[in-house]
Amino acid sequence: MDIFEMKFAKVFPLLIAKAERKGRTRDEVFKVTMWLLGYTKEELEALLESEATYGDFIDHAPAKNPVRMDIKGRICGIKIEDIEDPRMRDVRILDKLVDDLAKGKEIKQ
């Protein structure tokens, strides 16, 4: 199944779990997501209770941070800056930020 067709309520908790396994918190994952995509905590909570897809989550982000395009690195062996599909790039950027958070790296806002 395509990531964009999967339910947000199924995918996002996996990001939270990844961070929590390394001693980070749900609120820290929310904070990174809010910075990246412009959602409020309340909006993220509502999405977790909704039938929204992960594609909806990415496509309808209220305020994508333009600085996100400066984020570089690898996720799953793929260089983020080489990803041409803007939707997939945003997915991978969020994944990278959560990975960095889980590894204890400082997330510069």
Name these PLM-found stretches.
Residues 1-109:
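A charge-rich, low-complexity, intrinsically flexible signal that marks solvent-exposed coils, linkers
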